[in-house]
């Protein structure tokens, strides 16, 4: 197995300098509670250090950890940590497009990180390692990224990711026919798991490929694939890169994952590797799950309808500290 790097993006939405910069450009952008550019999209729960603790405890084999930020760093971060590389937006995004306040342009350019390995795993900062993982959880022995997927319709939810997924799939289906995708996608392989196979069976006779199911877990990616898609769809990806705030015309990082699936250049992952959770549902039972070791990876999404945010934040930090009490080498 070749070297595997981790890439994670982070923003401190409470930073006054960053807030002033954002306010300068936000203008007519919808930043209401449920919008795609709401405060929730930038909120920091104070749990990011546990992301690093999880990496050190549960994935000590990782080569480098690239932290991508906009001229920011957590106050507790040891920038001299051996495995850490800080990456500023100016290193990967054209200066003409900066500053950006959307994940889409940032994530679409992570392959430009200087020194990044061919094999890397991209994390959002709400995707935590909660039990040991191995390189083979993310890549096959011959270096293919591992995914668990299914045919699944794109959900047209207001303020959701449906627009981005449609744009991603529009590109993918312009290069791969329906029959090629059905052949290459391995949707009916038993290793996908019963739930995924049932989903795919429901939609296999559709005239068109309706979309791929998204697990919301870290994304194993190949730098060469991102370069290839950029070569083929530079104009589209440049438009996304120039999108200062989330825009319905954007593509997102799933495009590169979908390309791997449609081309058949992927291996099937463990369908029980992790799960998606929301802080809307946080309570005693959830905190027990967090510390149970049942899931190796947990994506813990911020919520739109958290009843008592202060209490949830306190409980969240307490539960993470119970799971990962020891300071990591990434901390001062």
From Swiss-Prot:
EC number(s) from the headed UniProt entry: 2.7.-.-
Keyword Transferase among record annotations: yes
Keywords, alphabetical: Exopolysaccharide synthesis, Transferase
One GO BP: polysaccharide biosynthetic process
The family this protein is said to belong to: Belongs to the stealth family.
Alphabetized PANTHER family for the sequence: N-ACETYLGLUCOSAMINE-1-PHOSPHOTRANSFERASE SUBUNITS ALPHA_BETA, PTHR24045
Name of the protein described by the UniProt record: Receptor polysaccharide phosphotransferase WefC
Organism: Streptococcus oralis
Gene that specifies this protein: wefC
């Amino acid at each position: 197995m070749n070297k595997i790097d981790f890439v994670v993006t982070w923003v401190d939405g409470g930073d006054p300098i960053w807030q002033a910069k954002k306010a300068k450009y936000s203008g007519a952008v919808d930043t209401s509670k449920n919008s795609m550019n709401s405060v929730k999209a930038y909120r920091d729960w104070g749990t990011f250090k546990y992301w690093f603790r999880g990496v050190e405890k549960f994935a000590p084999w990782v080569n480098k950890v690239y932290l991508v930020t906009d001229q920011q760093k957590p106050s507790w971060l040891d920038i001299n940590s051996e495995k850490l590389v800080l990456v500023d937006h100016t290193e990967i995004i054209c200066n003409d497009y900066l500053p950006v306040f959307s994940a889409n342009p940032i994530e679409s350019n992570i392959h430009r990180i200087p020194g990044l390995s061919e094999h890397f795993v991209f994390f959002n900062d709400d995707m935590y390692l909660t039990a040991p993982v191995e390189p083979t959880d993310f890549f096959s022995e011959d270096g293919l990224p591992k995914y668990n997927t299914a045919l699944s319709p794109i959900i047209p939810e207001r303020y959701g990711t449906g627009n981005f997924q449609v744009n991603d799939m529009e590109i993918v289906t312009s290069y791969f026919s329906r029959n090629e995708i059905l052949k290459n996608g391995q949707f009916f392989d038993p290793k996908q798991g019963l739930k995924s196979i049932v989903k795919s069976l429901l939609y296999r006779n559709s005239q068109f490929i309706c979309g791929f199911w998204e697990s919301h877990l870290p994304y194993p990616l190949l730098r060469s694939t991102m370069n290839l898609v950029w070569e083929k769809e530079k104009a589209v990806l440049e438009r996304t890169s120039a999108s200062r705030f989330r825009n319905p015309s954007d593509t997102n990082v799933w495009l590169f994952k979908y390309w791997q699936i449609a081309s058949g250049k992927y291996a099937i992952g463990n369908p029980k590797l992790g799960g998606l959770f929301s802080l809307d549902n946080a309570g005693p039972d959830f905190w027990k799950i967090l510390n149970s070791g049942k899931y190796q990876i947990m994506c813990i999404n911020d919520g739109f309808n958290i009843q008592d945010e202060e209490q949830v934040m306190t409980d969240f930090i307490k539960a993470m500290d119970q799971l990962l009490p020891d300071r990591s080498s990434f901390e001062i």
